[in-house]
């Protein structure tokens, strides 16, 4: 009896739909078409009695999707002629007023099966209206409700998830150049984020009414969209909206926790990374994630391992958010201590330092300093032994680095570590030039907000540390003093209105006179008179250039004295003046001086500073020798033999220099000559010999010969790799300046052999110098000579460059290797392109 009654109740719906489809498939009258559609429209929407509700549910469950597919299939030129604008609105309403999930699937599937036609245009129009009216929120909400059922249709939900997450890609493939703006990723994903917020708002209202809800499908949508690389478009709208909602509402806070917790593990990484990058601070990150880092092993791995140790692209704000989030709750602080120990181990490792690039080391240093700033005294005390061990080994490794930026970074971190270990002691202190990076590193010790767990340690005495209370008093006092000064000034006479004489450029007069002879300078350099020494060092380089013949007599002796003289802090710019004097001597008498310097470079009992000074002098002297001589007559040829006159000749200014009479005559002739057309005048280059070419071998070959000889106090292939790196760069400079020199090919062959021996050096600074040397050889030695005299070396070098460009851990090494490969290819093409 009950079964037959059920059949009678269900039969009318299926019969009506079947008859309507049969009639619509062969209809030719527009009015009748509208009547048939209206007869089926009654099954959409809510009904008043239970019978109509059952019919409505039956239609939605069994007949809605097939009927929509039939409507799409029938849409063509014939139906378009029968349907007016009002009738087309009725056709659209079947998609816009029925179950949103089924309508969305039918529209998306129809787009994939339909080519350019009226049917495609109509489906696109309906889908555009579907999105603009916010129906995506209804799709997500209906799927969320279906997941509460005992037997949810997982295949259907997976299909809807794929269509929602990749809708812009599907529409771009279907419409190509005729795509609509609403389907663009930059417009669609913010719209999707708004729909997710609407769904969460419905869930919030339902929870307040005591209803059971699920948001797992919304989490899946967020996860899959982020997995496809659209975190920025989605989360840039979703995260700020959630931030404003979770501030004072505990229900919204729990919804946010569940939203992130329900993301599948395979999509958790892009979601967490996107939230960390978008989160405005640690407090909001804690409100959004809760204790997810403790509950979910995947999230814990991401936040405590991968994002801190395996990646280095996060900005410092994101790092502060991650570590600050771990410090905000007692249940998570043990992870912060664990991270600190692991960071100390990584930072102090010599292997990590050698095989990591500067951005990676900067990332580790930032994480370490942020952790130090977030830990309290008790936690620091528990890690004190680890801090001491890491400080000792790490500081030594960083100080041995040949890269100045890395060495400076290690000094900053070592200083901060020592001060945190013993806040009352003196701590470590290094001398280095502060730049923006060092200031940023030091600022990381102070968290952006004072957290509850370590407030007692971060701020010892707010009244003393805060300048806000003392500033108003100081400002008021300065104002009173300014008023008093102004009143006293008004009482003075009018003579004080005159502008004071500018004495900013005045210099202090020295009692000692500048020496006039080179030998007098040597005596002063050997004495202990600081004032005479300062005067002598100021004019020594100029005096050497003015008295070349006298300088050549004592060039080696003067070089020896300047090389061994101790730094004089009391003499202003002493290091710069000493370097200028050494360069002037080397330029004046290059062969003996270069032989002495290159010989002393490998001698005993020289400090690293002296050896590096030798390299600087050689490179600067080679640069000066390769430049053209001035067209002015030399000071020594103008001198009459008196010392005072030679001194005067070296201090001529440009205005006092005698004018070139030929140039004056040519200008007068040009001014009195009338020309109807005149091109741009180009001065004729004056040929001049390159003084460096004649002495290049004396600077280059002695320096490259004994690099593998180990001395008790000097080991280039061992611990003194900083000097080795500087020497390699100096050799590259000497090679580059030898362009067009007869000896360039011999220098290039020797330098290629030198590079081949050291190509696998562990220090990145040395490898950078070797790659620089390769480029200088390619630029200085003609390609024909390279392929004739050293073809085998060039081929081996090319394969090595390709390997470095692909596998080297240092970014600069890879860049230099690519430059070398491009240069080789360009030189080869130039040769092949010539007739």
From Swiss-Prot:
Transmembrane segments: none annotated. Keywords: Chromosome, Cytoplasm, Membrane, Nucleus, Telomere. Its main location: cytoplasm. GO terms for molecular function: Hsp90 protein binding; telomeric DNA binding. GO terms for biological process: 'de novo' cotranslational protein folding. Residues 488-499 have a biased composition (Acidic residues). InterPro entries: ARM-type_fold (IPR016024), TEL2_C_sf (IPR038528), TEL2_Regulation (IPR051970), Telomere_length_regulation_dom (IPR019337). Residues 636-648 have a biased composition (Polar residues). Residues 455-501, 629-648 are annotated as: Disordered. Residues 464-473 have a biased composition (Low complexity). One of its GO terms (cellular component) is membrane. Regulator of the DNA damage response (DDR). Part of the TTT complex that is required to stabilize protein levels of the phosphatidylinositol 3-kinase-related protein kinase (PIKK) family proteins. Promotes assembly, stabilizes and maintains the activity of TORC complexes, which regulate cell growth and survival in response to nutrient and hormonal signals. May be involved in telomere length regulation. Belongs to the TEL2 family. This is Telomere length regulation protein TEL2 homolog. The gene is telo2.
């Amino acid at each position: 009896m009950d079964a037959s009654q059920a059949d009678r109740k269900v039969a009318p719906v299926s019969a009506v739909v079947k008859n309507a489809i049969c009639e619509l498939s062969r209809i030719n009258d527009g009015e009748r078409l509208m009547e048939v559609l209206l007869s089926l429209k009654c099954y959409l929407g809510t009904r008043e009695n239970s019978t109509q509700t059952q019919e409505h549910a039956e239609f939605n469950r069994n007949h809605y999707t097939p009927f929509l597919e039939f409507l799409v299939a029938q849409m063509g030129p014939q139906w378009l002629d029968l349907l007016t604008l009002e009738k087309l609105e009725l056709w659209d309403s079947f998609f816009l007023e029925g179950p949103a999930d089924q309508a969305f699937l039918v529209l998306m599937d129809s787009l994939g099966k339909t080519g350019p036609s009226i049917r495609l245009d109509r489906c696109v129009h309906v889908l555009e209206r579907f999105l603009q009216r916010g129906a995506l929120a209804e799709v997500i909400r209906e799927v969320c409700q279906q997941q509460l059922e005992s037997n949810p249709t997982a295949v259907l939900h997976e299909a809807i998830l794929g269509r929602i997450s990749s809708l812009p890609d599907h529409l771009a493939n279907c419409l190509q150049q005729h795509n609509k703006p609403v389907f663009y990723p930059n417009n669609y994903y913010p719209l999707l984020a708004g729909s997710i917020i609407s769904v969460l708002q419905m869930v919030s209202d339902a929870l307040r009414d005591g209803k059971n809800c699920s948001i797992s499908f919304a989490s899946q949508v967020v996860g899959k969209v982020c997995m496809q690389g659209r975190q920025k478009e989605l989360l840039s709208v979703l995260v700020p909206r959630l931030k404003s909602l979770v501030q004072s509402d505990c229900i919204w806070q729990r919804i946010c926790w569940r939203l992130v917790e329900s993301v599948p593990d395979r999509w958790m990484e892009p979601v967490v990374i996107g939230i960390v990058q978008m989160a405005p601070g640690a407090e909001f990150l804690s409100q959004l994630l809760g204790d997810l880092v403790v509950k979910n092993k995947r999230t814990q791995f991401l936040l405590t391992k991968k994002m801190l140790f395996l990646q280095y692209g996060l900005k410092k704000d994101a790092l502060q958010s991650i570590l600050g989030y771990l410090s905000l709750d007692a249940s998570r602080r043990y992870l912060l201590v664990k991270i600190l120990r692991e960071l100390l181990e990584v930072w102090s490792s010599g292997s990590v330092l050698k095989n990591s690039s500067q951005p990676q080391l900067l990332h580790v240093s930032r994480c370490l300093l942020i952790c130090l700033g977030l830990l309290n005294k008790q936690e620091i005390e528990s890690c004190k032994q680890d801090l001491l061990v890491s400080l000792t080994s790490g500081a030594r490794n960083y100080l041995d680095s040949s890269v100045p930026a890395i060495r400076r970074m290690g000094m900053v971190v070592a200083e901060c570590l020592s001060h945190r270990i013993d806040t009352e002691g003196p701590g470590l202190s290094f001398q280095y030039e502060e730049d923006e990076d060092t200031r940023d590193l030091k600022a990381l010790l102070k968290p952006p907000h004072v957290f509850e767990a370590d407030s007692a340690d971060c701020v010892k005495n707010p009244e003393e540390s805060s300048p806000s209370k003392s500033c108003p008093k100081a400002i008021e006092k300065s104002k009173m003093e300014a008023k008093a000064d102004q009143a006293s000034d008004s009482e003075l006479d009018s003579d004080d209105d005159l502008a004071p004489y500018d004495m900013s450029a005045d210099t202090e007069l020295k009692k000692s006179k500048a020496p006039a002879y080179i030998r007098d300078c040597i005596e002063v350099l050997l004495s202990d008179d600081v004032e005479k020494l300062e005067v002598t060092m100021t004019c020594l380089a100029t005096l050497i250039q003015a008295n070349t013949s006298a300088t050549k007599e004592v060039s080696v002796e003067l070089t020896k004295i300047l090389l061994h003289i101790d730094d004089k802090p009391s003499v202003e710019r002493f290091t710069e003046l000493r370097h200028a004097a050494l360069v002037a001597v080397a330029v004046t008498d290059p062969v003996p001086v270069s032989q002495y310097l290159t010989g002393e470079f490998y001698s005993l009992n020289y400090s690293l500073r002296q050896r590096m000074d030798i390299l600087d002098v050689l490179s600067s002297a080679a640069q000066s020798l390769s430049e053209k001589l001035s067209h002015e007559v030399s000071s020594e040829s103008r001198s009459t033999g008196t010392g005072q006159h030679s001194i005067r000749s070296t201090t001529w200014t440009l205005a006092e220099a005698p004018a070139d009479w030929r140039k004056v005559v040519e200008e007068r002739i040009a001014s009195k000559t009338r020309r109807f057309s005149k091109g741009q005048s180009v001065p004729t280059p004056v040929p001049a010999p390159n003084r460096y070419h004649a002495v290049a071998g004396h600077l280059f070959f002695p320096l490259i010969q004994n690099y593998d000889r180990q001395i008790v106090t000097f080991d280039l292939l061992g611990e003194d790799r900083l000097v080795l790196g500087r020497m390699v760069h100096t050799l590259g400079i000497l090679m580059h300046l030898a362009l067009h020199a007869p000896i360039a090919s011999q220098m290039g062959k020797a330098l290629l052999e030198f590079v081949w021996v050291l190509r696998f050096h562990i220090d990145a600074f040395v490898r950078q110098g070797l790659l620089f040397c390769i480029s200088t050889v390619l630029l200085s030695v003609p390609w024909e000579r390279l392929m004739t005299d050293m073809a085998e070396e060039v081929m081996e070098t090319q394969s090595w460059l390709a390997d470095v460009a692909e596998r080297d851990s240092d970014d600069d090494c890879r860049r230099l290797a690519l430059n070398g490969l491009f240069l080789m290819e360009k030189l080869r093409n130039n040769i092949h392109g010539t007739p």
